[in-house]
Amino acid sequence: MSHSSGTDMALNFSTASLHAWNGVSLLLIIFVTWIISGMSQAKSKIERLLICWWALTGLIHVFQEGYYVFTPDLFNDNSPNFMAEIWKEYSKGDSRYATRHTSVLGIESVASIVLGPLSLLAAYAVAKQKSYRYIFQFAISIAQLYGTIQYFLTAFLEGDNFASSRYYYYSYYVGQSSIWVIVPMLIATRYWIKIHAICKRLQDKKVTKVG
């Protein structure tokens, strides 16, 4: 597989420092959310982990992806702006971000404006054990899966040639984006099984009453 030269922009921060600060920020969000989830109505560790996932993904959608959507000139920003630097670094794996390709701009717009707030609401729903939490998490996970598949598919249809090297292709484009395939798929499967079980119990109860 050949790859285009991509977008190798001069960065104010080293790649290692960007990954370190980004990683620390994400871990801090997870840690704080985990502590808070312990004071919630969540009934199991899995539900507490789900609260962490929805809080983390919601904040990423709203702030990180929202920054990309609503800052059209971020790639011209030469100041040591951490958020802009993150996107400049990621564009090494997908140069469509640097050119603000309509496909990624559309996907990121939906993610930041719609899926971000809904993900945060999902975290609240699990924490408060709301009756709609199963169907809500299932629906948002399907939407995330759809967006990620669309992201991969649009690149494939245009030649899948947007990374500056194989390293960035597999570590950034494939590796990071695959998280939004694997986790939503696991959550969607979990709640499909739970919703199906509830529907079956209701159906069996109805049949018993009729009989």
Swiss-Prot record:
The gene is MOI1. GO terms for molecular function: C-8 sterol isomerase activity; cholestenol delta-isomerase activity; steroid Delta-isomerase activity. This is Protoglabretal synthase MOI1. Isomerase involved in the biosynthesis of glabretanes triterpene natural products such as glabretal, a component with in vitro antiproliferative properties on lymphocytes. Catalyzes the conversion of 7,8-epoxymelianol to protoglabretal via skeletal rearrangements. Pathway: Secondary metabolite biosynthesis; terpenoid biosynthesis. Belongs to the EBP family. InterPro entries: EBP, EXPERA. The chain crosses the membrane at residues 16-36, 50-70, 104-124, 135-155, 179-199. Its EC number is 5.3.3.-. It catalyses: 7,8-epoxymelianol = protoglabretal. It is an enzyme of class 5 (isomerase). It is found in: Membrane.
